[in-house]
Structures are given as structure tokens and as C-alpha cells.
């Protein structure tokens, strides 16, 4: 399986827009880069951010819906903890798996939210949840091992598997199914080479949230396949807006805890994307191996960021509640505005802070740059004609869609939707 297409970047020296994959090929031609890495695409959201920043520097006004980054400031008490760490000289190396204080705070949070108990030797801390996922795959995959991923998926999952010589096995969760994996599809995808199932609920990019019944159906399959481990990416756990609260596989089926890695972090819930703290909780032997991997890459997470993360988990949680309420209002706004635009439709996501909008009604239309044949063409049309930046659905493994992040100011949503509506009206009239 080839990973989804990347977004867009720039050719070196020429400055003209090009697919990020073409950029990657241009800069690695005749280089020392190994064959495995040549399969890997740059992150589409990061590539899009580069283009958006360049366009803004050139004076273009862009409504940016590409990055999943809360626009709020890190809560003051968390930032103060980081400042206090600096002032107090807490600026040295820590253990590769994180400070005991932070790991105790993580254990307390997991017991409170999931009802699951983890010892300090079952928890490790890294430079963001992405590093935790990467370390788990590095520590566990043998060449050719298979990892099941549900499309639409977070863009990094397949490439991280490939980077570690595994094979991504993509199973589509269609829109008619709420963009979710069902038990029958999971059962059919499992082979003797299957090593992991990656679950992400709430989901990036679709906002899908698995109900307890849906999670139960998946865990019943997994119980029958003891070789298959579960990587449960729960970074968006607080962001649930509907009747269904977040549920983890270890809550539904505690027997799976012995082969489940819970992944979470500080970036989303506490507006700490730049602090770079994520964590994993799971069986001690896996955690030890992951910590060894990270000790040979980053040595340890930032001591300053760890102090702030501990304050976040142990302190007042009202900022999280307030953020969720703000994002729910933004979700309602962007869904209403998108569904009012001809050729675009979207369901209301139950979680995270993304809308995965269906743009099938725009495919085949002719814009100023030619026919819109793919959702990548649609995303480029939005950028060039409306100054609206989104990520194409092909990058997430399922077309014809585009992803909007609503982790941005209400005014940006309103302005972006106004410009998008005008551009699409002109397209439909052409």
C-alpha cells in the first residue's frame, strides 16, 4: 500500500508550488538517503504550513484550516511551572523515560479517566505523542510485520510503519459507517503477520468517536487474536461533543491491557504543541524497549517541559473544559457554513477538532487552472481562489474529501467560509 499523497511545497530555487512528493524527490536526488526513507512522504500538514507561511510573508491573506493546533495560549499556571523550573535550575537531563513526578501524574490521570492502574515502569515520556508511536513501532516491528490502520487515518501512521520496515494494511471506514472500522473488516484484515492495530478515537481527520458498543465489537475480535497488539492513540480524548464519551479498549476489555499501548500527550488538551510532551502506558517490557529507543535519539524529554506537563495534569482542569466548549461552538459553526456551500457536504463530527468534508460535488468542475479532477485539485483551488488552506483527503487515505481544522478563531472561520462560498459560487456558475 502506498501512503496517501502529500500536500504541496515548493521546488528549491524556483519557488513554484509543487506536490510535496516532487519536492522530496528533488532534494534527495543523487543523495545519501537510503531506499527505505525514499518511500516516506513529508507530513502534508507541515508542508501546507510552510506554503501558508510563505504566502503570508508575500502579503497574501490566508484563512488557515490546516494545522491541528489549538489557538489558545498555554494556561498560565502551566507556563509558570515551566518558568519556575528554569528559575530553580531544573534544566538538566532526566531519565530517558521521564521524571518520576511526571510519571506519577500520568498514572494518576489514567486511573482517574480510564480506571486503569499503571506502575511507573509501565509509563514512558517522549518528545510528543508522535515520538511515542514511533518508538513503539521501532521497538516491536520486524521487517514485513503488518499494521492495520483505518482510513481515513492520521497522515503519519502509514509512513511511520514504513520507516520501521513494516507494512501498513489500510482498511477503509466509509462515510456511511461514520469513518469507523467495524468488526468484520478488522477480522478480515488480520493475518499471521499482523502485529498492531492502530486505533484513534476521537479520530484525526474525521472526528469519529467509537461508542462503547463499537469498541466492544472490535475488542471481541482482538481477544481471539493474541498476537495482535493495540496502539490506542487517545490524544483527542477530552474532545467529545456528542452523547458518546471517549472509551478506551482497556476500559471495555481489561484483558487486552497486557497488549495495549495507550498513547496520549499534552499538545491538544492543554494547548502545549510546542512544549513537545507525549506519553505511553503499557506492558513494562514494551515500555522499557521504547525508552531505550528514545534514549538513543533524544536522550530524554525536556526537563522544563516535563515540569509544565506535571503541573498540567495535577492542576486545575477548567481550561480543558472551557476549550472543549469553545471548540464545540466552532464545530457547529463550520459544519453549518460548509453545508450551505454547493458541492460540499459534511456530517457533524462527534470529537476532535476536524471536519472531513465531502467535495464530490466539486470534482469535474472547471476552475481558472483547469478541471478539478481530485480532492488535491480542490484543495489547491481553495487556496488559490479563496485564500483558504485545507488538506486533501488523499493524504488521509480516503477521497474525495478535504480536512478542515476548526482549532482556529471564530473570525477566521467566518471569513474563510465567506471567501470559500464566493469562490465556489463562481466555480459552479462557470
Positions of the model-derived regions?
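Extreme N-terminal basic, low-complexity initiation segments
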Residues: 2-7
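Aromatic (phenylalanine/tyrosine) cluster motif
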Residues: 8-11, 23-24
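PLP-dependent class I/II
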Residues: 23-33, 37, 41-64, 68-85, ...
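A glycine-/small-polar-enriched, mobile loop at the entrance of the PLP active site in fold-type I
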Residues: 63-69, 84-103
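Conserved N-terminal alpha-helix of the aminotransferase class I/II PLP-enzyme fold
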Residues: 93-126
